[in-house]
């Protein structure tokens, strides 16, 4: 009888105290991805389990994107889309990667295309300010005299969510552009 009670308590502890797949997707996404086939085996996979695997891929993709490892980020986001082809986080990540690659090319045509990709990223996650920051950078690189579009992009970036370092960068870029705009306007008066 004692053994039964101990076993029951151990089983209860394991089921109640072990992290859920959804929690693991955030804290240890590598483990979830490594066990993807096991988690998704069977005919009746729960939506929670499926979304946990999608979240794990997105977490890995976001980390790789932040580290500027675009190939790895792209791979992870594409894996996410295989499981959930309308996933906004994965689509946002892919749009940002494409935009950044085009921005890096630097030619006029690529800059126009990067603006389109950054705009697409804002569609998938309108709360983020980073795509607007890159739009401002692309407008500056394309035509640094187009002050209205540059200022608008940086101001939109500040309305969105930015990490503290990027927020400072955007504020500095905006101040510099406004100063150049003022100098330009006073010169031509």
Name these PLM-found stretches.
Residues 62, 96, 100-103, 137-139, ...:
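Residue-level recognition of tetratricopeptide repeat
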Residues 84-127:
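Alpha-helical adaptor scaffolds
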Residues 45, 151-189:
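Terminal, low-structured helical/coil segments at or just beyond the last alpha-helical repeat
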Residues 47, 54, 88-95, 129-130, ...:
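Helix-start (N-cap) detector for alpha-helical repeat units in TPR-like alpha-solenoids
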Residues 52, 59, 93, 134, ...:
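Canonical tetratricopeptide repeat
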């Amino acid at each position: 009888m004692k053994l039964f009670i101990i076993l029951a308590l151990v089983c209860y502890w394991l089921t109640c105290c072990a992290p859920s797949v959804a929690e693991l997707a955030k804290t240890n996404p590598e483990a979830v991805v490594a066990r993807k086939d096991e988690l998704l085996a069977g005919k009746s996979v729960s939506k929670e389990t499926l979304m946990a695997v999608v979240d794990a891929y997105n977490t890995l993709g976001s980390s790789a994107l932040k580290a500027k490892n675009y190939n790895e980020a792209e791979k992870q986001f594409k894996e996410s889309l295989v499981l959930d082809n309308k996933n906004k986080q994965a689509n946002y990540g892919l749009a940002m990667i494409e935009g950044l690659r085009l921005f890096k090319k630097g030619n006029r045509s690529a800059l126009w295309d990067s603006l389109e990709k950054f705009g697409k990223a804002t569609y998938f996650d309108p709360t983020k300010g980073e795509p607007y920051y890159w739009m401002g950078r692309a407008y500056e690189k394309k035509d640094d005299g187009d002050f209205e579009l540059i200022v608008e992009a940086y101001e939109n970036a500040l309305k969105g969510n930015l990490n503290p370092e990027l927020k400072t960068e955007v504020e500095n870029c905006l101040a510099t552009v406004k100063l150049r705009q003022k100098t330009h306007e006073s010169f031509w008066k």
